[in-house]
Amino acid sequence: MLEFCPNELDTKTLHQYLLSGIGPRPIALASTIDQNGNKNLSPFSFFNIFSAKPPIAIFSPARRVRNNTTKDTLENIKKIKEVVINIVNYKLTEQTSLTSCEYPQKVDEFIKSGLTAIKSKKIRPFRVQESPIQMECKVNQIIELGKNGGAGNLVICEIILIHIKK
């Protein structure tokens, strides 16, 4: 059996061990907007549901390892505390992968991925029409877990409206 202390591994190797150790992993396709209304769409594998009453989902945009910067998603929700968590199924795998590419800030990942943006009912960010479950959320809290590349930021979201395809 392999044994190691996490602080003895480089971030990339540790990340791979952690992700492969827990599975299958649900994927949150998070939709946000910036202060100018530009849409952003990004997948997160650090994601799950943590409470039913109140209904709480948490996902974690990590700081980039290569340059210790943060993602547009995190910057957007710091200013506009709303997010749609769209659940990814097998049919959305390829399109979701396209949203994970590094695009300049104002590039619309809905267009790049071919996914359809539809208006939400209670918040400003758009839903992904093709997603089987779409959760409109208010961001209650962001907990920064560290300052180094690879450090997560827990985004604690209260689900205020759920859309489920029949």
Which residues does each PLM region occupy?
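Active-site-proximal mixed secondary-structure blocks
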Residues: 1-42, 48-166
